[in-house]
Amino acid sequence: MAVEAAGKGNDTGESAATTVLGKPGVLHGSRTLLMQTEDGQVVEPYSISAGLDYPGIGPVHAHLYETGRAQFYSVTDDDAMRAGVQLSRLEGIIPAIETAHAFAALNQMKFNNDDVVVINLSGRGDKDLDTYIQWGKY
C-alpha cells in the first residue's frame, strides 16, 4: 500500500496524487506516471509536505500501480495534519508531515482484527513544527 499527497483535493488543481491525476510520460529519462498537460508539459504539483510535492512517481511504483500489485491512497493536507496532531497527542511522537499522510490513510483502509499493520515512521516532525502551528493555529 502506498499513500500520495492529495493537497487541497484531487479536484482542486492543487494536488500531487499522480496515480489519480497522472498519465504515462517521461520525466528525468524514465517512463512513469506523470502529472502533465495534454502536450506533455509537467503540471506543477502541490502538497503541504515538501517531500511529497512531486509531479510523478518512480517507474517501479508506476508498474506496481498499473499491474494492480499495489494499492494507492490519496490524502489531503488537512487529513494528514489532523493525523499528525492526533499521533502527537496520543503517543507523544511528532511525525514528519510526509509520514502523517500514511497515518491519515489508515482511515481509508479495511483491516481484519488479526492483521498486523506496519508504518515506517520516517523523518522528524520537529522540522515541521512551524507548519503544524500555522495550520492549526495552536
Predicted segment positions?
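Thiamine diphosphate
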Residues: 1-3, 100-109
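Generic enzyme active-site microenvironment
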Residues: 2, 96, 118
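Catalytic phosphate/nucleotide-handling subdomain of diverse soluble enzymes
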Residues: 15, 105-138
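Short, glycine/acidic-enriched loop or turn micro-motifs at the edges of active sites
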Residues: 7, 101, 126
